[in-house]
Amino acid sequence: MTNTRKTHPLIKIINHSFIDLPAPSNISAWWNFGSLLGLCLIIQILTGLFLAMHYTSDTMTAFSSVTHICRDVNYGWLIRYMHANGASMFFICLFLHVGRGMYYGSYTYFETWNIGVILLFAVMATAFMGYVLPWGQMSFWGATVITNLLSAIPYIGTTLVEWIWGGFSVDKATLTRFFAFHFILPFIIAALVMVHLLFLHETGSNNPSGLISDSDKIPFHPYYTIKDILGVLLLVLTLMALVLFSPDLLGDPDNYTPANPLSTPPHIKPEWYFLFAYAILRSIPNKLGGVLALVFSILILMLFPLLHLSKQRSMMFRPLSQCVFWILVADLFTLTWIGGQPVEHPFIIIGQLASILYFAIILLILPTVSMIENKLLKW
């Protein structure tokens, strides 16, 4: 008698993806983040669904409805803060997942990698629109500043911005459409995740050595299911510690003031996970140049497969490239710090140097160092 798990048309797909999937025997904890991102997405969709049951997307009542959720709804405060801090956990996992891909050369699976970059854009768009929904000061002014960037597009810019706003400023129409998009995008993300996995399972997973591991595979279950459960426990522990002990740690106090179009907050800044891109945007004095730098700071990830000049896939045995990689990580931390600082000396020049270094490392230094390593190894 054949096993239902292997013959049933629907269960068979799940079996090939999560149970009998042949996985390399040596993948480290850095490979846990895919499943953790899946968990984050599920948490966000579920908490978001319950929040949407009580939220009203109207400028007059949006702020009050969030207050109502926190004060009057059973465990509403828990759902709201799980959703807000869940986004932070989502981005921590995302950045680590992308960093893993860069370090171990996973970008050579370029279909999987490019879908991943599109997913990153989609998650960033969703998070941005979600930040607008509570209709606090930072929600309103963040939406105004970021949507206004589109006016830098030649010829159609101004029309485009007014079209997105649904009027001549960020108002009721903007909030309503942002809520609609914020609701639908996670489901589009879930569909893209399926495509991401489809492409990944065409080739199989990469591993820390970067070598082909076809001759040494082990079943995903029980080995990596158990390993993933450990990651899940650590993620949930961190998230709940954040939610229950300091839920506002990563938020902005300005967002507890209802949106007021007549008073600008002293420092307009996005959530922490956008600060690196915000710093790159601000480091260029020209509006269009800044917008292009902002978009290209993420889009540049798509160039990684083309810029890979090393004869080795992974950085595991490339100490020079490792050095450059960790300088890039330090540079991103610097950009994140600068993004949260006011636009004044010395932060302006530090931001400009960090932005130049970011693009220089990816476009110039890493490929050059890769070629030097090839030469040193007489390849």
Swiss-Prot record:
Q: Tell me where in or outside the cell this protein is found.
A: Mitochondrion inner membrane
- One GO term of the cellular component aspect? respiratory chain complex III
Positions of heme b b566 binding: 97, 196
GO-annotated molecular function: metal ion binding; ubiquinol-cytochrome-c reductase activity
Q: Which cofactor does it need?
A: heme b
Gene3D superfamilies attached here? Answer: Cytochrome Bc1 Complex, Chain C
Q: List the membrane topology term(s).
A: Multi-pass membrane protein
Q: Membrane-spanning residues where?
A: 33-53, 77-98, 113-133, 178-198, 226-246, 288-308, 320-340, 347-367
Q: What else is known?
A: Heme 1 (or BL or b562) is low-potential and absorbs at about 562 nm, and heme 2 (or BH or b566) is high-potential and absorbs at about 566 nm.
Q: What protein does this entry describe? A: Cytochrome b
Source species, please? Spermophilus fulvus
Q: What gene codes for this chain?
A: MT-CYB
